[in-house]
Regions:
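Sec-dependent N-terminal signal peptides
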Residues: 1-3
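C-terminal motif of bacterial Sec signal peptides marking the signal peptidase cleavage site
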Residues: 7-10
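Extracytosolic ligand-binding ectodomains
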Residues: 12-426
Length: 426
């Protein structure tokens, strides 16, 4: 699993440059009184000799562990590279599992907020988990920065209206799926010249939100959405749903879902009357080796974040994608299996910079102002990360928002990740 390393090393830079800032390790005996915050959300006091507490909340077991494990490892690498904050070490404790579900997100968030020493969270992996975790984290005065949540409902409609699941203190380095939906719609309508398409979701906030974003954008371009329906994540027989879709005679089907359901859709669609030759399209949930190497995935188009990071450098640590991937493989024996590893690394350094800006040493202890942590992130502009330049809007969208579409060759996973056939940037 070395494809992501090839992408980072071989592809061109977007010409983002590092501002050269780095994390110094000030002595714990120094006094710092120019930190951000007004105390309105409380202050965390870290006693001398103790660690600053943050948490990783990601899907680290089950079918979506391929997404959460690289996220957690990205956080761990960022902590190691960043170093101490004002002489205090930072720890994630034991990684928590969001189970890629609302129940999992809620249970883990309850554990987090019960510990008043926790300052912030990197997670969740899945948008569905965030819908339940975010309100609890917000109410506790903490922050949560997600590397891979993409549902528009968690932030905004990009036109000034908060999403139904937006809560203050929530941020993300991942893109907003309104951009990904627009990218795939533009690709299908303008590049493939297909004017009739259908979409399938599984009811999850991520899959349904992205399918809807695609459908809306496709219709705005002049296309016709011939079908919009859902499957259950546990379904293995997709023929009834595909037969329903076939009735509309679409030229393409976009199914931004996960494995194993995505495996069955790709496998069974060509055998359904009326769908022979239909173009199959997926998204970042299927942009993984275990799916892309399946015979039924051959020739498919898959959208996701633009991984062509080139020489982009994280301004806090000086780390590039090439360096990150070399360290990741050395530490773990394999390359990341999912495309949000750099988003996780950048999310972690943002949190660490926010804590640094909102804290000072007093009588040998570190005082961290919770409101100051949010203040730093709310005003973030022009931060240079591995993924590019990050700036946070009023609803927590901080990511680079660049999307690519790749065409899959099931016999060449590494080459497929690099096989960009369409690029989109707002």
């Amino acid at each position: 699993m070395f494809a992501f390393a090839l992408v980072a090393a071989a592809c061109g830079s977007d010409d983002d440059s590092s501002s050269g800032s780095s994390s110094d390790s000030s002595s714990a005996t120094e006094e710092h009184h120019d930190s951000l915050g007004d105390g309105s959300l409380g202050v965390v006091t870290v006693e001398a000799g103790e660690d600053i507490q943050i948490r990783s909340l990601n899907a680290i077991t089950g079918d979506v562990a391929f997404l959460g494990i690289p996220n957690q490892r990205g956080v761990e690498q960022a902590l190691a590279d960043f170093g101490d904050i004002h002489g205090f070490s930072v720890t994630i404790g034991t990684g928590l599992d969001d189970l890629c579900s609302a129940d999992g997100g809620q249970a883990a968030a309850q554990t987090i907020v019960a510990d008043e020493q926790v300052v912030g969270v990197i997670g969740t992996s899945c948008s569905g988990a965030a819908t339940a975790a975010s309100p609890l984290i917000s109410e506790a005065g903490m922050v949560m920065i997600s590397p891979s949540n993409t549902s528009p409902a968690l932030t905004s409609d990009l036109a000034g209206t908060a999403g139904e699941n937006y809560h203050p203190g929530y941020y993300r380095t991942a893109h907003n799926d309104l951009f990904q939906g627009a990218a795939m719609a533009k690709f299908v309508y303008e590049e493939l010249e297909i004017s009739e398409a259908a979409a399938i979701h599984d009811g999850d906030p991520y899959t349904q939100g992205l399918a809807q974003a695609f459908a809306d954008a496709f219709e705005n371009l002049g296309g016709t959405v011939t079908g919009f329906t859902g499957v259950n994540k546990e379904d293995t027989d997709m023929v009834p749903v595909l037969t329903e879709i076939a009735a509309g005679s679409p030229g393409a089907i976009f199914f931004p879902i996960f494995q194993p359901a995505g495996d069955f859709v790709a496998d069974q669609a060509p055998g359904v009357s009326g769908l022979d030759g239909v173009v199959l399209l997926g998204a970042d949930g299927l942009q993984v080796q275990t799916f892309m190497e399946l015979p039924q995935a051959d020739g498919m188009y898959l959208s996701g974040p633009d991984l062509r990071y080139g020489t982009n450098t994280n301004q806090s640590t000086g780390v590039t994608a090439e360096k990150f991937l070399a360290d990741y493989e050395a530490n773990n024996g394999n390359a990341p299996e999912a495309p949000f590893w750099a988003h996780s690394y950048d999310a972690a350094t943002l949190l660490l910079e926010a804590i640094k800006a909102a804290s000072h040493v007093h009588d040998g202890n570190l005082e961290i102002d919770r409101a100051g942590v949010r203040e730093y992130l709310d005003n973030l502009s022009g931060y240079e990360g591995i993924i590019g330049t990050l700036s946070c809007d009023d609803f927590g969208d901080c990511g680079a928002q660049r999307i690519t579409v790749v065409q899959n060759d099931s016999a060449d996973f590494a080459g497929s990740i690099e096989n960009v056939v369409f690029s989109f940037a707002p």
